[in-house]
From Swiss-Prot:
Name of this protein: FMN-dependent NADH:quinone oxidoreductase
Cofactor, how bound (note): Binds 1 FMN per subunit.
Subunit-level organization: Homodimer.
Native organism: Shewanella sp. (strain W3-18-1)
Physiological role: Quinone reductase that provides resistance to thiol-specific stress caused by electrophilic quinones.
Enzyme class: oxidoreductase
Domain of life where this protein originates: Bacteria
Flavoprotein listed as a keyword: yes
Length: 198
């Protein structure tokens, strides 16, 4: 049975368009028998902002404060969750041309030297290999393949850095450019999901 980790990152709750698409995707895979874990980074599973104390603690060590120990344990949980699943689905709405801070927090918690990547004499090497990732990205405007899209290139870079290079992308564009454009963007995205999950 396939195991899927879904990361929601919208802060819009019931108004989230990325959540609508993620739920559409999840229903397909659930019907196919996949085991799905959902982490709502913009809602009930929001993570603490990584500050200097937390970042230092994530490097480990013998003399960690109670807060650092707690955050290191949280990071270990998130990394184990990432490694335990075959497919990682990331809901990535575009906020001011980039990803939500809540999703960036998750990245900061799981991107750890010696744990999800390592450095060699020839550069970095990802340690989370053999996985598939699906990015579901929603935007108010039209940014696909253009210089204003800092969502997909960034996430592909992060995923490749930790070893995940099999990445598929579902775009929902122009969602704030009028009712017709919204409906067209959502319809095309759902069609892409239908093909991806068939």
């Amino acid at each position: 049975m396939s195991k899927v980790l879904i990361l929601k990152s919208s802060i819009l709750g019931g108004y989230s368009q990325s959540a609508v698409l993620i739920d559409h995707l999840a229903s397909h895979w659930e019907n196919q028998g996949a085991a799905i874990t959902v982490r709502d980074l913009g809602g009930k599973d929001v993570l603490p902002m990584v500050d200097g104390e937390i970042a230092s603690g994530l490097r480990g060590g013998a003399e960690l404060s109670a807060r650092q120990q707690e955050m290191l344990a949280l990071s270990d949980t998130l990394v184990a969750e990432l490694k335990a699943n075959d497919t990682i689905v990331i809901a990535a709405p575009m906020y001011n041309f980039t990803i939500p801070a809540q999703l960036k927090n998750w990245i900061d918690f799981i991107a750890r030297a010696g744990v999800t990547f390592t450095y060699t004499e020839t550069g970095s090497k990802g340690l989370v290999e053999g996985k598939r990732a699906v990015l579901v990205t929603t935007r108010g405007g039209a940014h696909k393949d253009g210089p204003t899209d800092h969502v997909v290139p960034y996430l592909k870079t992060v995923l490749a850095f930790i070893g995940i290079t099999n990445v598929e992308v579902v775009y929902a564009e122009a969602l704030n450019m009028g009712p017709e454009a919204h409906d067209k963007g959502m319809s095309e995205a759902k069609h892409s999901i239908d093909l991806l999950t068939a």
